[in-house]
Amino acid sequence: MADPQTRADYRYFLPITTRWMDNDLYGHVNNVTYYSYFDTVANHFLITEGGLDIHTGPVIGLVVESACSYRAPVAYPDELSAGLRVDKLGNRSVTYGIAIFRDGQVTDDPAVAQGHFVHVFVDRADRRAVAIPDQVRAALQRLVVAP
């Protein structure tokens, strides 16, 4: 498991409001819900900052790999923030580092969960890999962190 990440390790943040339905029988947010949070922050960034048109644009991003390490439980009604960065920016794909933080934490408090997503950009019609659109690439470039 990678070392715990802090907010300082991320470049973009999105508030996440937990919902009653996110909790499972054990009284904490269920593991699958974290992937929804990951997907939400990545796509929010692509749409709002990169101009990706998910409804009619010729290019879309598909998740081809994901992982998550859980470090501390959260539960409704916790308020969270999802942190996003770019760990690797290729010609047709991007690897995001993503972490979830409990709001109210200080800057150096560790993430409650952290992981990654790999998006491959494809032609909407035939699903073949294509180059990341220039506007999207420019936005992603702002999130790149040094290895």
Which sequence ranges carry the predicted segments?
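HotDog/MaoC-like acyl-thioester-processing domains
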Residues: 1-12, 73-76, 87-147
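Hot-dog-fold acyl-thioester-processing enzymes
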Residues: 2-64, 123-147
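Preference for bulky hydrophobic residues occupying beta-strand positions
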Residues: 16-18, 68, 84, 98, ...
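Hydrophobic beta-strand-centered segment that forms part of the acyl-chain substrate-binding groove
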Residues: 45-94, 112-114
